[in-house]
Amino acid sequence: RDSVPMAVQAITSEELEAKNISDFNDIANLVPSITVDDSGSGNSYFYIRGVSDGGFGNRAGAQASTALYIDEQPLSTIGGNPDLHVYDIERVEILTGPQGTLYGSSSQAGTVKIITKKPNPEEIDLGFDLEYGDVHDGSPDRSLETFVNIPLGFIDDAMDSAALRVSFYDLHTGGYLDNVATTQTFQYLGTHSNSDYIELRDDYNFSDKKGHRVRFSNEFDNGLNLDISFLRQEYLSNGSWESDVAEGARKVSRYTPETFEDNFDQVSFTLSGPLTESIDFTLTSSMFERDIAYTYDYTQYVAYTGYDLYAAYYYDYDYYASTDPRVFYTQFDKYDRTSNEFRIQSVTDSGYQWILGMFRETNEQGYQTFYDFTGDLTNSSWVSVDDRWWGQDNIRDDEQRAIFGEVTVPVNEKTDLTVGFRKYETENDFFAQDGYFGNYETTDTGYFEWIGRTNLYQLGDDGVAPKFNIAHRPNDNLLVYGTYSEGFRPSGINRTTGRTAELVPDTYNSDLLKNFEFGWKSTLADGKVTFNGLIYHMNWEDYQSTRYVYNLLTVAYVDNVGMSTVSGGE
């Protein structure tokens, strides 16, 4: 990586194991340019070089500014990345700065690639790790990790270059937050204690995670390589990762149980090999499916009244006076992401190198949100559907198509020029439905039922992201380079209502990050010392900001809010 004229950091399998790296937070601790906004497993997102609007992980928000890959598949999701357990990994690559030409949208500020270990047809290999840890003022952690590598040549001579690698992990993370007794006074219901409704317990926020990965590879006699991989991970947590300072250190006070379930499957297929003597090809297809279900206690919000009916979820609930103060928030998310890429690249020994490819991706995100109550209404003339007092049901379809390429041309024996581009087109469909507890129509039986609002939005966009790089090697121990590159996030659609249509934009434009970078890589003291660095200045134009304004919309929306600059060094 010290010979590549770009900012890249690689964490090897040996370093991952030596430092007991197990999740993305551990990776971020090794990379100064990465910042993690951690709201618990599956609800965290990260950014590189500070390129963030300070968004709060809302599912209706803008796409991520930094891409997460596992092998050849992008996994970044709006509102929170999957919390992949790091085990049996070959290396982790961190590419800082815009990677828009080769990696596309959401690689606006950089890309993190987790590369799994490939099966080895040469030898049988297996191993396992057992861990047990004690959490101060909490419950213990424990984990089991194991892998096995099996060459398949014993099946048939034609399988001499084939192998299967299987890994498995099962982890329990102990809690350290206590759910303690508290009281809350409600305007219509008086004072209630949470101990009347929920079992109070110490170490409230524990979690379990387990998963397995199966990977098969085979190199055929004609030089073709086939690689097939399947990954599944299941995660379940109890409790909250928030704390209430009014109750004391590491304490919360909840009225309803809270859980978070996050399961995903990933399947990938890669075929690669020589197309001609001087050209190789790679064809990859991958699918990613993720299902999330979680509940969140919302009871204490009910204590506040008097806001606009259309902006305050709790108003209807308190106005019509339930006999039970408990309110909870439930959400169901479903992600289906399919990616296909075909690329060819030169494999000559000359300084002239190139890569050319095509990419297509479909990404469907469905999310349902409900604010539910548990008690009976004191005014029996008002009824709700499934005890819900506000709900939304949304399906967001994004499609992206692109062609991309880079070419490196030697200017002279010591200087190379690289030019790249990505021509992309995006299409967005957004089906949205929501409604309040007080939004009713009369049925034949004389009861009322929720009707809500339904909208369908559509949007298309296109653009070109360029890259220019010049690299100069004055001697064998020094490389200096300069880069201009662009990264982007695609345009999108907001859900608006009639009364705020003139205040909230129906759509938002793609934003653009323009990066100017100068760097160097050097070795000193006969190769014993490595000294690398860079400085950068980035202009973030029309940057997308996720906003929530209670008196405008019941959900978050995205707006282009101007230009920002980011400068720094690494």
Residue ranges, per PLM feature:
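Membrane-embedded beta-barrel scaffold of Gram-negative outer-membrane proteins
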Residues: E145, T270-P274, S278-Y298, R473, ...
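Short acidic/polar hinge/loop motifs at secondary-structure boundaries
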Residues: N58-R59, S65-T66, D71-P98, T146
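Transmembrane beta-barrel wall of Gram-negative outer-membrane proteins
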Residues: G127, H136-N238, N263-V267, D336, ...
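N-terminal periplasmic accessory domains that precede
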Residues: Y45-Y47, Y69, P82, I94, ...
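Structural signature of Gram-negative outer-membrane beta-barrels, strongest in the C-terminal barrel
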Residues: S217-N222, I344-V347, M358-E361, N394-M538
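Solvent-exposed loop segments that connect transmembrane elements
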Residues: L177-D203, N238-Y255, D297-T330, F370-D393, ...
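Extracytoplasmic beta-strand/coil segments of soluble accessory domains associated
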Residues: N25, N29-Q73
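Outer-membrane beta-barrel domain signature, strongest for Gram-negative TonB-dependent receptors
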Residues: N194-I355, R360-N363, T530-N532
